Amino acid sequence: MGNKENVLAIIEQTKVISIIRGVKETYAARLIDALLDGGIRCLEITLNTPGALNIIKEARKREGIVVGAGTVLSLEDTQKALEAGAQFILSPERE
């Protein structure tokens, strides 16, 4: 199974994506571990959270987790998020 299929399989299995928004970077690792302990394996880190790219990198250190970037507003943000390890991208509607 390829990366895309793995990501989709985990999302389908868990049926829950936890959104991490506005969490201080210093608390991110503990929050991620607590979510994993509670069975949450799919996370979206919003890019309007200070240190979001570092939080994505931190989350990706764990096994069996899917990590995405949310509130992505530009191609540049998309590239940075993917470089940080995001496995999916979410963007709000924009006119």
Q: Language-model segments: which ranges?
A:
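Conserved N-terminal beta1-alpha1 strand-loop-helix module at the mouth
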Residues: M1-A84
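Glycine-rich phosphate-binding active-site loops on the catalytic face of alpha/beta enzymes
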Residues: G85-E95
